[in-house]
Design a protein with these regions (language model features):
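Short secondary-structure junctions
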Residues: 38-44, 100-104
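Loop/turn position at the start of each blade in beta-propeller repeats
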Residues: 14, 48, 108-110
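Vicinal oxygen chelate
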Residues: 25-27, 79-122, 130
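N-terminal beta-strand motif that seeds the catalytic metal site of vicinal oxygen chelate
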Residues: 1-30, 57, 77-81, 129-144
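Conserved short beta-strand elements that form part of the metal-binding/catalytic scaffold
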Residues: 40-74, 122-128
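Amphipathic alpha-helical segments
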Residues: 25-41
Length: 144
């Protein structure tokens, strides 16, 4: 087996289009992702129980899980949101009432700060400041 990841054998998956973010209160979530985080909203269809927010490369599809017949289990693994400066972004969100889990930390290649949306979905402010470690696979299709 190869140590480096590379193109697949032409499988059917091309990319990730959206990540579903469950909520129990769609109006509250729309306010949080739009007003608090400042993400542009592209769709809000209350009668269909969802809204979508855009980042430059991925859509966050906020769904009223229970109204769609799905158990509302928060995303705990985390959704990493790229920012230019974690410290500045954190300070701005703290001014808007966001509470963070612990201090901002440095992994040696990036800075991260963890927080939750009102439903307990973990979000991460993230900024990579160093190249990927040597020996790690390059991301297929990533901009140079």
């Amino acid at each position: 087996m190869s140590e480096q990841a590379g193109p697949t054998d032409g499988g059917p998956i091309e990319r990730v289009d959206f990540v579903a973010v469950p909520t129990k209160d769609l109006g509250r979530a729309v306010d949080f992702y739009g007003s608090t985080l400042g993400l542009p909203r592209s769709v809000y269809i209350e009668e269909r129980h969802y809204a979508e927010f855009e980042t430059s490369n991925l859509t966050l599809s906020v769904i009223d899980a229970e109204k769609m017949g799905i158990e509302c289990e928060p995303v705990r693994s985390g959704i990493a949101l790229h920012v230019a400066d974690v410290g500045q972004a954190r300070a701005k969100l703290e001014q808007r009432g966001v509470e963070f889990e612990g201090e901002t930390f440095d992994t040696g290649v990036c800075h991260m700060a963890l927080f939750n949306d009102p439903d307990g979905n973990r979000l991460i402010l993230h900024h990579r400041y160093a190249p990927r470690p040597s020996g790690s696979a390059e991301r297929v299709g990533a901009a140079a």
